[in-house]
């Protein structure tokens, strides 16, 4: 589970399995359906598959990965983000990128992992003035290049 996503109140989990001597396949997902006061929204679901290459031993030390991602989001009216106090964004995000990570073994069953990645995301979304009035301001499409993945995960091995 990714502790950084939990910091945004987003429950998440992932699974990873060996596919060959130096490769593993991971699948991470997140879902946030919390409702906050004053029509504040931070709703999303996310899926992120990743193929990882481990130069030495799997599940130990450095790794490189190639990831894809898809998310549906409905976020807005967040008072502590400038420009989002009265706006809601609802749409899809998809793309992919590359990942670097490091895996620390803590014992027979537990590990900690840190990852960072960069790549591309395509966003297609509708912008609304407020949740209550439902006034759509327009439909937008954006291309993004930059950080696409960051995480610190607590891992439990099932053998």
Regions found by a protein language model. Give the residues of each.
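Mid-chain, structured segments of secreted extracytoplasmic proteins
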Residues: 40-77
């Amino acid at each position: 589970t990714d502790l950084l996503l939990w910091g945004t109140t987003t429950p998440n989990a992932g699974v990873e399995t060996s596919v060959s001597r130096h490769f593993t396949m991971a699948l991470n997902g997140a879902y946030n359906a919390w409702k906050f006061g004053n029509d504040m929204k931070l709703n999303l679901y996310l899926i992120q598959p990743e193929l990882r290459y481990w130069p030495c031993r799997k599940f130990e030390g450095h790794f490189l990965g190639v990831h894809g991602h898809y998310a549906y989001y409905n976020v807005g009216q967040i008072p502590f983000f400038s420009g989002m106090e009265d706006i809601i964004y609802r749409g899809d995000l998809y793309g992919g990128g590359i990942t670097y990570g490091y895996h620390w073994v803590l014992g027979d069953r537990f590990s900690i992992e840190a990852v960072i990645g960069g790549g591309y995301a395509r966003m297609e979304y509708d912008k609304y003035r407020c949740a209550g009035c439902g006034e759509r301001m327009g439909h937008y499409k954006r291309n993004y290049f930059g950080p696409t993945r960051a995480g610190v995960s607590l891992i439990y091995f099932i053998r």
